[in-house]
């Protein structure tokens, strides 16, 4: 079976890997402006607790470097920034330009871009050297990644 013939799940559909990437992009383009509100409503706000709970286990300290993959609008990045402090660095990546645009606007309004960088990048092929970060996180974005093994390697 060739790469083009390989089928993956997208909701209740079976689609090609390329088609899934395109469809996921279209979904997030269409919801980016309301993404934060949508997360709050769909999870009854519990996603905020889950993110805080996860970050209790990062081991991050002042001055460290963190990477958040599939960052969306940057909620997790703000919490990571609190852990690494002003002398640390947080890099947020997302494949979707609309989500990064919303995140950048929100973070700029909150005054949170000091030691934070946003980069459009595919989680399956990140442009970073190995062992460059003290901590790497990914929240709910993992469910939308086509090749999870590539993203997690």
Question: What annotation goes with each model-predicted range?
Answer:
Residues 124-135:
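A short acidic, Gly/Pro-enriched loop at the edge of an enzyme's catalytic core
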Residues 145-153:
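A short, conserved alpha-helix within the catalytic core of class I
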Residues 1-25:
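N-terminal auxiliary segments of SAM/dcSAM-dependent transferases
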